[in-house]
UniProtKB/Swiss-Prot annotation:
This is Lysine--tRNA ligase. Mg(2+) 1 binds at E413, E420. It holds the Pfam family tRNA-synt_2. The keyword Membrane does not apply. The gene is lysS. The lineage of its organism: Bacteria, Pseudomonadati, Pseudomonadota, Gammaproteobacteria, Pasteurellales. It comes from Haemophilus influenzae (strain ATCC 51907 / DSM 11121 / KW20 / Rd). It catalyses: tRNA(Lys) + L-lysine + ATP = L-lysyl-tRNA(Lys) + AMP + diphosphate.
């Protein structure tokens, strides 16, 4: 018999015993009571009483009602020490036969298993080792767990099981719970920041007839009642800018985007984005906003501007570097023989890209080639927080052209740790220019570029009514959460990441 078969046999045997215990509970009446009311959380009790002198605490006779999942138990004859875990942390229980009604210790507490959820009433005291503990006077089994905790709670180490059965991961791993608490604080902090700046939170369509706002491959579905194909949105941008046209001059949205593309440590097909738009601002203002926001999040969440990620360390208290795409490519491509002239001539750029092993697509113009060269030689060098400016207009179909050099745009991308975290720009509000760029995207799609944008004629009509000078930005919430939680994979910060079916 294999080791796996032995484990499955043991599991089946343990589950059978637990089901028999549940059957006995059902025979007594309500096996899943719902009348217990907790009045204290474990961590709150530790915060308030850990420093209290044991004798003084005993004299106070503080009564509490706590509840949680049984994580450990140590039986010592007529008494048992039990550790329960609630949403805030863990606390120890002292359950003694003599402190309970007759028969309860043997007939009730004696049948409890690891993983069961219990409600406890008792008084606080300190053990000889000075551990805050609840001396139990009343007990109630609230939920009988039919399956044991993973590996008797020695830890859940199988990464795939952690992702597929996140509930087990959260029960077993304090670090995972911390990660998702940090993620929640990131979202709450962003919302608080923008509301304090006078922005209005809005919601725009998830199902769109024309997917727009980014260059990506969309998910396609069909609306039966309307008999029309629809797309899960790849970005909310075009709808948010319609709202600015309508007079909502500061708007933001925290919501999901969907892109039918690859899965990696940095990519999940379903992900969360912040996207915001500010009228009468330009991309310089948004870079300032972003620095301020990330600095505030670091202080509020970590208590410091120093953010550690793996072996890297970032100081969000310092000004972020700002460099153009062309300058970064020349700076970090010098050891590969790249010079300025290679980035401003189509034939030289194409030859340079091919020399670097880049497969140049037929639909690419100079801007796309230069961007590919940048990604090959420079992107991974942008370790410290860096705003990359001056992206080619060809790859920025919604961004405003730079006044001094119309071949590039007033756009920035934020890189931290060699990864893109955010993307923003002064918005293109010239309806005729936008129409021409949409036509160029259509031509690229017809030439085989699956990620080229669809043309949204209604958006052009909206621009024809007049969009004030506006700047907008998108920030990846998942990647920000990875950063603040020091999580190596995007799957570590998404509660239920996309997984291949078994």
């Amino acid at each position: 018999m294999s080791e796996q078969e032995v484990k499955e046999l043991d599991l089946n045997g343990e589950m059978l015993v637990r089901r028999e215990k549940l059957a006995a509970l059902r025979a007594k009446g309500n096996a899943f009571p719902n009348k217990f009311r907790r009045d204290a959380l474990a961590q709150d009790l530790h915060n308030q009483y850990d420093a209290e002198d044991g004798e003084i605490l005993k004299e106070k006779g503080i009564e509490v009602q706590v509840a949680g999942r049984i994580m450990t138990r140590r039986a010592m004859g007529k008494a048992t020490f039990i550790t329960i875990q609630d949403m805030s942390g863990k606390i120890q229980l002292y359950v003694a036969r003599d402190n309970l009604p007759e028969g309860v210790y043997k007939d009730d507490v004696g049948t409890w298993d690891l993983g069961d959820i219990v409600g406890i009433k008792g008084t606080l005291f300190k053990t000889k080792t000075d551990e805050l503990t609840v001396k139990t006077t009343e007990v109630q089994l609230l939920t009988k767990a039919l399956r044991p905790l993973p590996d008797k709670f020695h830890g859940l180490t199988d990464q795939e099981v952690r992702y597929r059965q996140r509930y087990l991961d959260l029960i077993s791993n304090e670090e995972s719970r911390r990660t998702f608490i940090i993620r929640s604080k990131v979202v709450a902090g962003i919302r608080e920041y923008f509301i304090s700046k006078g922005f209005m939170e809005v919601e725009t369509p998830m199902l769109q007839v024309i997917p727009g706002g980014a260059s990506a491959r969309p998910f396609v579905t069909h609306h039966n009642a309307l008999d029309v194909d629809m797309y899960l949105r790849i970005a909310p941008e075009l709808y948010l800018k319609r709202l600015v046209v309508g007079g909502f001059e500061r708007v933001f949205e925290l919501n999901r985007n969907f892109r039918n593309e690859g899965v990696s440590v940095r990519h999940n097909p379903e992900f969360t984005m912040l996207e915001y738009y500010q009228a009468y601002a330009d991309y310089h203002d948004l870079m300032d906003n972003t620095e301020e926001l990330l600095r505030k999040l670091a202080i509020d969440i970590l208590g410091t501007t120093i953010v550690k990620y793996g072996d890297l360390e970032f100081d969000f208290g310092k000004p972020f570097e700002r460099i153009t795409l062309h300058d970064a490519t020349i700076k970090y491509g010098a050891d590969k023989g790249i010079v300025k002239e290679d980035l401003y001539d189509f034939d030289r750029a194409k030859a340079t890209a091919e020399r670097l092993g880049i497969e140049v697509q037929k639909s690419w113009g100079l801007g796309s080639i230069v961007n590919a060269i940048f990604e090959e030689v420079a992107e991974h060098h942008l370790i410290q927080p860096t705003f990359l400016n001056g992206s080619p207009a060809e790859i920025s179909p919604l961004a405003r052209r730079n006044d001094e050099n119309p071949e590039v745009t007033d756009r920035f991308e934020l890189f931290i740790g060699g990864r893109e975290i955010g993307n923003g720009f002064s918005e293109l509000n010239d309806a005729e220019d936008q129409n021409e760029r949409f036509d160029a995207q259509v031509a690229a799609k017809e030439a085989g570029d699956d990620e080229a944008m669809f043309k949204d004629e209604d958006f052009v009509v909206a621009l024809e009514h007049g969009l004030p000078p506006t700047a907008g930005e998108g920030l990846g919430i998942d990647r920000l959460a990875m950063l603040y939680a020091n999580a190596p994979s995007i799957r570590d910060v998404i509660l239920f990441p996309a997984m291949r079916q078994k």
